[in-house]
Amino acid sequence: MVTSSNLNVIFESSSLIVAVGDATTETLLSLGFPPDIEVVDGREMRVKRDPPISNYESLIKVNNPNSCLTEEALQAVSDALSKKMPVRIFVDGEEDLLALPIIALYPIGTIVVYGQPRVGLVINCIDQQIRKSVITILNKMNVTL
């Protein structure tokens, strides 16, 4: 079970926390861990919902259809690092796959949190091993960063 005390242990060593997904962002906010970058689409398991209420400073809007990684979305992931934080990337379409370029591009030590439907939160601390695995997946998808 995710609690603020066990998240505190995980998050204390990271200078950047990224949430991918509306429910994931909402969970982190409710536990007192506002993400530095949140990627949301106003949907939960493809059902329309209100996006989480958060105090983001910068907003990037992109189009990214289901099961795709568009150039526009990839650029937004890259651009978010240079915006005033916290940043919301709002996706018209689907945000799920954006965890992959985030893991491939963001600094080592970044915490990336996303949801596994009907299971719970997945928390990854970017290291060289996970980055290499994700780049292999992106290459198989013919995605160039």
Q: What does each of the following model-derived ranges do?
A:
Residues I126-L145:
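Charged phosphate-binding loop/patch that engages nucleotide di/tri-phosphates or the phosphate backbone
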Residues M1-R131:
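Conserved mixed alpha/beta catalytic, RNA-binding, or beta-rich assembly cores of soluble enzyme
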